[in-house]
């Protein structure tokens, strides 16, 4: 009997060890995001499509079947000349044709379904989709008889379509249609993760991005991007990391790679644990095709037992074409005196936002490469079209010259000498941000050497909810000699619907229809 009990207890303990090992393994999944340089010149539309498809298949093969999910970026595959239908769901793999399939499903989409099956991975791609119009009269039909959508399509490991999303917030896409109402797209995997997904410009607005996180509780998010970076607060990887941090979610962000047009930036981020993999092409005019891989925790707040990514501080010329924040002239700012061994405590206010700054710095030369300003801004910013965000921010940012208009410009002499730097040894920002039902407040940080955000070992962040405000403290954990941006960035999605700054003209612009708005701007 004693022997039996010993053997029984040994068997139980062995089983528990196996169970524990499996549970450790099952705490992660392997994700890949692709920074992709599209082929867009040098052939017919069909030839360009085939060249991009070949690039996609080559990248998928390079993963060697190790990934659980691969994400490709926005607008890097087909064009409005080589459209495809996209089914919402399919019971069977799209790899083989079924009798009731839409005849407008293009062969390239089937090739990708076959690749998903071959490599046993979930696959997210972005396509230009053709949707035949169901017209009841000539008045309801467009001249071309079909609509075009900017669409994400998701395949499971067998190549079946399990999710589709059509972009809601369009950005400089005159030939693309919107759906009648926004779509909220999710899918659940066999590794017990439910993903939400959207496209590029959507990330700056509440719907659908924040709907996924706040209304549905999604903690794993995918975004396909062709993002134009803007200094000092909205470069691609900087914004991706801040967004994942503020929402405490895992984010898989796949970006197009056209640095000559200001487009680059991909990464995998685990909430407030920072970047697990990331890439910004800043020192070249030609983009890359690269698969970034990371072991992603099922729980974004579960501590990761891997070394933090800290890129080397190697200064190289910045060739990435960058946009500039359009409202800098309206900031309330104060210029830091470029005096060696200085320290300052400063309180700056604008409208309902006051921020307290504590800064200590030293110079490694009497003529540093950048000047710096402390600034606060409450206002509304415009993007390239008649689309707006209400912003509250306060921070420190680099300026090419003495004027505030030079902030967010990269120095032309991008041979960053070691002795031309400003070293910040102490930096703290304390801000009280008015509470609103729908807003997102995130850390916005950027290093001039790498164009990446600061990692958790370099940044401390805390939030305290009070009666009418949220008190946020942001602090530099260690000295830093290559800061471009160190700021608290608040996006207030419903500012005017919730008793905001009271700009009546802006409120009216938000209420009238886009057609009338375009007419007014033309006038």
From Swiss-Prot:
Primary location group:
membrane
Per UniProt, subcellular location reads as:
Cell membrane
* Residue intervals of the CN hydrolase domain: 29-298
User: So which tissues is this one expressed in?
Assistant: Expressed in third instar larvae.
Alphabetic keyword roster: Cell membrane, Glycoprotein, GPI-anchor, Hydrolase, Lipoprotein, Membrane, Signal
| Lipidation residue positions, type GPI-anchor amidated asparagine | 498
What is the protein's given name? Vanin-like protein 3
Native source species = Drosophila melanogaster
